[in-house]
Amino acid sequence: MTELDKRHRSSIYDSMVKSPNRAMLRATGMTDKDFETPIVGVISTWAENTPCNIHLHDFGKLAKEGVKSAGAWPVQFGTITVADGIAMGTPGMRFSLTSRDIIADSIEAAMSGHNVDAFVAIGGCDKNMPGSMIAIANMDIPAIFAYGGTIAPGNLDGKDIDLVSVFEGIGKWNHGDMTAEDVKRLECNACPGPGGCGGMYTANTMATAIEVLGMSLPGSSSHPAESADKKEDIEAAGRAVVKMLELGLKPSDILTREAFEDAITVTMALGGSTNATLHLLAIAHAANVDLSLEDFNTIQERVPHLADLKPSGQYVFQDLYEVGGVPAVMKYLLANGFLHGDRITCTGKTVAENLADFADLTPGQKVIMPLENPKRADGPLIILNGNLAPDGAVAKVSGVKVRRHVGPAKVFDSEEDAIQAVLTDEIVDGDVVVVRFVGPKGGPGMPEMLSLSSMIVGKGQGDKVALLTDGRFSGGTYGLVVGHIAPEAQDGGPIAYLRTGDIVTVDQDTKEISMAVSEEELEKRKAETTLPPLYSRGVLGKYAHIVSSASRGAVTDFWNMDKSGKK
């Protein structure tokens, strides 16, 4: 490949009439020699407001060094982030999922607006990963995602703790099982430094999924944020994206149907977040890959849950790194026929070739259970259907002993009202707490319910009270919870007409989610109900008017997909 071929976009600056453009670029340090090399963007979601992202500006500098050492010209950019753990339980949570698509759009705008030939995207918090990947898939130029790494566990009285420990501490305090001082000690020790939340929560789930897809370097997702391996991974990403340019390797070569099947497989085996369904659907949509909720159930039925990771297990993601990391898990699954080993990745090698360089899981380790004795015989993410969710709903059942829950609904139109009911002991064992009008359009922004779910678990009701919503759950959530109910209430889905006292059934064996309300009664309620208007101001107003159903990934450009799958 010639240098001009590698400069498939930046060569636009070569002509005489682009002299003014080059004048601006010279002010940034470029010389005649630099104009002969590819321009590679390095874009991160660096921000000082959260440990997930506070270190990413320095990581951007490392990626630049990698790009430069490979003979290209690096240019660093920045985009936004919304910290879920800080926004949780506040009006700011409506901006979390919204930020995924803002990140995607801003990366595409910055990289396309400056005609870069390739780029490295660096992210840390939950929506950074899918936002970056949507942009990568839409642009289809050589690109690599590099994860900022997982946070180290906090330690209190010799025990590992994390952010979810604090959320659950609120429920224990309300139940009288913890003092305010106990909660304060959790608060002050849960987050010891930089990195994404430390269990198999959404950030680590999506970083893992991207590595499995083949769009991050092998090992990237499980390297702790403060490790030497992580720094090397970031710099290597800069070198690797230049190699992608040399090979003419594009995301569309990597993001195949088989890649998404493998990403779902590893997500099931590790017990990943429910948000993986939403984000993988959105990334697949951007990549023109046909993927649906039904695919998750198909894979769920054949892939066992192996990882004893938080939130339902006892280990954090750093523990997985110490016994071999995601590559060792993939190697184990590949050897047992669960993965497609012959597909290409961002290294230019196949999955099998990449994994050949890694060791097996450490003998005697306890983080990953053997296939012959799994934590659960099938996957923990289940797609439910029924007259309460005709287009589907997502349940995470890892650690849940109850197979079937039938109980009366207690219906709330906001999380705040539901939280108040929990705090005042209005929620009793057997209840089905329903929070609606918090979907993609209704929220707007489909906020997560970690504050609410953690309070229920903290009060000892995690297996005794079901929690249903057309909103989302944090990857840190566990218990009897069902989210992403579609159609959402704002779209006139059946959940909009559910009433307190109606009997609701959730069954993980039959994959049922239903309400004991006849079609005749449902039609009567529809006639009696006026749905609220869509939010209409600012970015949330824009989002509410264009976002798709959660069953389609809550994407903001669904209108332009024709039957052939072409955009």
From Swiss-Prot:
Catalytic residues identified in the record: S474
A Pfam family the protein falls into: ILVD_EDD_N
Function: Functions in the biosynthesis of branched-chain amino acids. Catalyzes the dehydration of (2R,3R)-2,3-dihydroxy-3-methylpentanoate (2,3-dihydroxy-3-methylvalerate) into 2-oxo-3-methylpentanoate (2-oxo-3-methylvalerate) and of (2R)-2,3-dihydroxy-3-methylbutanoate (2,3-dihydroxyisovalerate) into 2-oxo-3-methylbutanoate (2-oxoisovalerate), the penultimate precursor to L-isoleucine and L-valine, respectively.
Provenance organism: Streptococcus pneumoniae (strain P1031)
Catalysed conversion reaction: (2R)-2,3-dihydroxy-3-methylbutanoate = 3-methyl-2-oxobutanoate + H2O; (2R,3R)-2,3-dihydroxy-3-methylpentanoate = (S)-3-methyl-2-oxopentanoate + H2O
Quaternary structure note: Homodimer.
Record-listed Mg(2+) binding positions: D84, D126, K127, E448
Biological-process GO terms, alphabetical: isoleucine biosynthetic process; L-valine biosynthetic process
Modified positions (N6-carboxylysine) in chain numbering: K127
Alphabetical list of NCBIfam families matching this protein: ilvD, PRK00911.1
Keyword Glycoprotein in record: no
Annotated HAMAP family: IlvD (MF_00012)
Domain of life where this protein originates: Bacteria
Known cofactor(s): [2Fe-2S] cluster; Mg(2+)
EC number, UniProt record: 4.2.1.9
Protein name as annotated: Dihydroxy-acid dehydratase
UniProt KW keywords: 2Fe-2S, Amino-acid biosynthesis, Branched-chain amino acid biosynthesis, Iron, Iron-sulfur, Lyase, Magnesium, Metal-binding
Pathway(s) it belongs to: Amino-acid biosynthesis; L-isoleucine biosynthesis; L-isoleucine from 2-oxobutanoate: step 3/4; Amino-acid biosynthesis; L-valine biosynthesis; L-valine from pyruvate: step 3/4
Residues noted as binding [2Fe-2S] cluster in the record, renumbered to the chain: C52, C125, C197
GO molecular function: 2 iron, 2 sulfur cluster binding; dihydroxy-acid dehydratase activity; magnesium ion binding
Lineage per the UniProt record: Bacteria, Bacillati, Bacillota, Bacilli, Lactobacillales
UniProt family annotation: Belongs to the IlvD/Edd family.
